[in-house]
Regions:
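Conserved nucleotidyltransferase catalytic core and NTase-mimicking acidic/glycine-rich helix/loop elements
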Residues: 1-140
Length: 140
């Protein structure tokens, strides 16, 4: 899930130029073909943690509460699972044959599904502009 979070927030950081940057920055880019302001904006943006970037988008774009809950509660559950030494050790020792029936792996899978549902809602359902950007730049 951490890789998905990093990938998703990388996309969001790029999309933030269009969705969250000031009109002046976007105008400077279009009218003057100057990327200086946009570069500075991105430089500041990428200094945030992935969870901060995600939270900013959820708040600024007024994404549905249900989506935010799915994303943050599932990620919190994932971190809690990783913090559980017994479960982490069990997953490390898990054989390929045991994956389909392992209770802890099933727990990870369930948490991951909820996180994926949140990402799908965020990128494709809750905000029209974000959906357009995802289809144009994120789906080849």
């Amino acid at each position: 899930m951490s890789r998905k979070l990093i990938f998703a927030t990388g996309m969001l950081s790029c999309f933030s130029c269009e969705t969250l940057s000031s009109p002046e920055i976007r105008e400077d880019l279009v009218k003057n073909h100057s990327t200086i302001a946009m570069e500075e904006y991105l430089r500041t943006s990428v200094q945030k943690t992935p969870l901060e970037i995600l939270a900013t988008f959820l708040l600024e774009l007024k994404i549905k509460r249900e989506t935010a809950v799915k994303l943050f509660s599932s990620y919190n559950a994932f971190l809690a699972l990783l913090d559980d030494v017994e479960k982490r050790e069990r997953l490390k020792k898990l054989s390929l044959e045991d994956i389909p029936t392992d209770v802890v792996f099933g727990e990870v899978r369930a948490i991951s599904r909820v996180f994926q549902e949140g990402l799908t809602a965020l990128f494709f359902h809750d905000d029209a502009k974000l959906r357009e950007l995802t289809i144009f730049y994120g789906v080849f």
